[in-house]
C-alpha cells in the first residue's frame, strides 16, 4: 500500500505557473497524496484561482519567503512524508513515486532530492540537490551542467 504524503507548494504571485504545475501533478503515477498550497500574500489573482479550483490552501497575510511558507505547510501536514515543490515546476509522471521509493530504501534516509532541469534551457540542470557540510552550510550540486 502506498504511504500517504503531502505535497507542499509555496506560492507568491505565481498564477502563471499554477495550471502547468497542477496539470503535471494530476498525471502522477503515485496518487496517494494531499496537496497544500501556502500562499505568501499574492496579489496577482493566485488566491482567487486557488479558491475557484478548490485547492487546499493556507493564505498568509504577508510574504514570509520560501522557508516561512513551507514551515507553515509542514506544520499543517499530517503524513509521514512531505514533498516541497516549487510552483514553477512540472514534475514528470513518476516523480512522486521515485521520491517515495528512494525514501523507503533505508530507515537511515532523512531526505531526498531530485535533479531539476532548467525550464527554458532543458539541456541544462538547474540543480541536482543540495548537500550540507557538518557546519550546516548548504551548496548545490550540478548547477548549469
Segments and roles (model prediction):
Residues 90-132:
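Conserved donor NDP-sugar-binding/catalytic core segment of glycosyltransferases
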Residues 9-20, 41:
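Active-site beta-to-alpha loop of glycosyltransferases that engages the nucleotide-sugar donor
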Residues 23-32:
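Short, acidic, metal-binding catalytic loop of nucleotide-sugar glycosyltransferases
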Residues 59-77, 87, 98:
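Glycine-rich, basic loop-to-helix element that forms the pyrophosphate-binding segment
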Residues 24, 39-47, 62:
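A conserved acidic beta->alpha catalytic loop
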Residues 3-6, 34:
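Cell-envelope/extracellular polymer assembly enzymes that use nucleotide-activated donors
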Residues 132-145:
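Short, flexible, basic/aromatic active-site loop/helix in glycosyltransferases
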Amino acid at each position: 500500500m502506498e504511504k500517504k504524503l503531502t505535497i507542499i507548494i509555496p506560492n507568491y504571485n505565481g498564477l502563471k505557473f499554477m495550471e502547468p504545475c497542477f496539470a503535471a501533478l494530476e498525471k502522477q503515477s503515485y496518487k496517494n497524496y494531499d496537496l497544500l498550497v501556502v500562499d505568501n500574500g499574492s496579489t496577482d489573482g493566485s488566491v482567487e484561482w486557488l479558491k475557484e479550483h478548490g485547492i487546499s490552501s493556507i493564505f498568509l497575510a504577508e510574504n514570509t519567503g520560501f522557508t516561512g511558507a513551507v514551515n507553515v505547510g509542514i506544520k499543517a501536514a499530517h503524513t509521514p512524508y512531505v514533498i516541497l515543490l516549487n510552483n514553477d515546476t512540472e514534475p514528470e509522471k513518476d516523480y512522486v513515486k521515485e521520491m517515495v521509493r528512494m525514501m523507503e530504501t533505508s530507515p537511515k534516509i532523512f531526505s531526498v532530492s531530485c535533479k531539476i532541469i532548467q525550464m527554458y534551457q532543458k539541456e541544462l540542470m538547474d540543480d541536482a540537490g543540495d548537500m550540507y557540510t557538518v557546519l550546516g552550510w548548504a551548496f548545490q550540486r550540478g548547477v548549469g551542467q
